[in-house]
Amino acid sequence: MAVISMKQLLEAGVHFGHQTRRWNPKMAKYIFTERNGIHVIDLQQTVKLADQAYDFVRDAAANDAVILFVGTKKQASEAIKEEAERAGQYYINHRWLGGTLTNWDTIQKRIARLKEIKQMEVDGIFDVLPKKEVALLNKQRARLEKFLGGIEDMPRIPDIIYIVDPHKEQIAVKEAKKLGIPVVAMVDTNADPDDIDVIIPANDDAIRAVKLITSKLADAVIEGRQGEDSVEAVEAELAAGETQADSIEEIVEVVEGANEN
């Protein structure tokens, strides 16, 4: 059984790519057709490749891999945080700071500063400091939490990075490639898939699409860490909603109908 059904992908709008003039020709093999100036992603490939991504992440998680979820665009920010936390993993959902991976020692120093400020409050030091100084410390803490809070407890450089929109997160992709870290990514029709190790062709601009794919990869982590029993509910949900388009022609009919509305 597929991890994500065709019906789920269609309902979440995973099939809608970018305008044809914004495409990357390297994504041609993942594009089914063009409708009204929009590329339509081949969801039969998405189903297959999502399965491969799920298995890859699950198997890595079973071996205690550290997985970093990355998505800083507004459509991805909330889902990245929620699903990474649900899976007991780590995330960056605001701006990617250059050197997050390649200059990990410096990043760790900033994380140590964040923890130091938090501990100062716990120890009651804030109570004896001037209000102006406390305000400055709180401002510093807020900024550090915004950019580093999701990796505050990450024990080491991640073993895998999952990225929503590698076109936007090019710095993260380059750092991962430099360090030999595998990248799993939602790749839209405007992106370059060459540096992505595990590709999931998908609309990365729709909140529902991002949530769907990201939640399934979080499920993969949970299954890998806890065993198949932990995802019985997920499988039951899939079985209940397994009615799906059986052919690529049916997908086109659905897509054309959606475009006309």
Swiss-Prot record:
GO biological process: translation
Record key words, sorted: Ribonucleoprotein, Ribosomal protein
A single GO molecular function term of this UniProt record: structural constituent of ribosome
One Gene Ontology cellular component: cytosolic small ribosomal subunit
Disulfide bond entries: none
Top-level taxon: Bacteria
Keyword Cell membrane: no
Entry keyword Ribonucleoprotein: yes
Family according to the record: Belongs to the universal ribosomal protein uS2 family.
Identification of the protein by name: Small ribosomal subunit protein uS2
Organism in which the protein naturally occurs: Streptococcus mutans serotype c (strain ATCC 700610 / UA159)
